[in-house]
Amino acid sequence: GFEVIDNIKDSVVILGGPNWNVKMGDIRPLTGSNGEIRFDNNYFK
């Protein structure tokens, strides 16, 4: 499935496997154990 992040851009990072590009507000297919949504306010500081 897809997780669509658009309202809490400053605190959301979408992480996947080692080949994924990670951007705020991105849409990525999250499948298996390699897909994770992490809420971390300090990530971009």
From Swiss-Prot:
The protein's name is Peroxidase 3
Keywords for this protein: Calcium, Heme, Hydrogen peroxide, Iron, Metal-binding, Oxidoreductase, Peroxidase, Secreted
Q: What does this protein do?
A: Removal of H(2)O(2), oxidation of toxic reductants, biosynthesis and degradation of lignin, suberization, auxin catabolism, response to environmental stresses such as wounding, pathogen attack and oxidative stress. These functions might be dependent on each isozyme/isoform in each plant tissue.
Enzyme category, top tier: oxidoreductase
One GO molecular-function entry: metal ion binding
Q: Which Gene Ontology terms describe the biological processes this protein takes part in?
A: hydrogen peroxide catabolic process
- Show which residues constitute the signal peptide: none
Query: Bound how, and how many: what does the cofactor note say?
Result: Binds 1 heme b (iron(II)-protoporphyrin IX) group per subunit. Binds 2 calcium ions per subunit.
Please provide one cellular component term from the Gene Ontology annotations of this protein: extracellular region
Q: Which cofactor does it need?
A: heme b; Ca(2+)
Q: Which domain of life is it from?
A: Eukaryota
Question: What is the source species?
Answer: Capsicum annuum (Capsicum pepper)
Record field: catalytic activity? 2 a phenolic donor + H2O2 = 2 a phenolic radical donor + 2 H2O
Please state the Enzyme Commission number of this protein. 1.11.1.7
Family in the record: Belongs to the peroxidase family. Classical plant (class III) peroxidase subfamily.
- Compartments (UniProt record): Secreted
